[in-house]
Amino acid sequence: RGLGDVYKRQPQDYFYFSVAVKGLTGGHSGDDINKGRANANKLLVRFLTQLAAKYPMYLCEIDGGNLHNAIPREARALCAVPMKDKESVRVDLNIYTAEIENEFAVTEPNLKTELSSEAPCKEVIDMVTAGRLLKAVYAVHNGVYAMSQDIPGLVETSSNLASVKQADRK
């Protein structure tokens, strides 16, 4: 038995927007995972988790990364918050962007975020399910688990959140 329908009709009086993390260095998940590079999926979900804790936010879509063995350079989500929170979300993104630019100043000199107004989604993921999804993705470890004891500098075990995709509803 399934979990039921997690989608609901678009809410009215909401600001629909896309938010993206772009310009990251990326790299191979085996060769570059120990270089301190940012993961676009993790950065995006970190921001969305903060928004969901602060505002009644709906998630419409999420998409990041393309290859199973690459550190993702870009990620994007389509969300909605009450119209009254529109400017606060923009301010929050500016603050968050400054934080992550500082955090990854050495490894991600071209990091940028974008927020754009969008047309309303036909359907949104309900807030409870979206919150659980964001928390689950946020909790996924990304990085080195263990280095080789025999070969200096060799990553032995690691985890890379390479791709976050939302399947079509059919």
Which role fits each region the language model picked out?
Residues G2-Y7:
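Short, small-residue-biased leader/transition segments that mark boundaries at the very start
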Residues P11-D32:
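Residues forming anionic-ligand binding surfaces in small-molecule and nucleic-acid pockets
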Residues F17-V19, A77, T113, K170:
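Hydrophobic residues positioned within well-ordered beta-strands of beta-sheet architectures
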Residues L154-K170:
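Substrate-recognition/cap regions that form aromatic- and gly/pro-loop-enriched pockets
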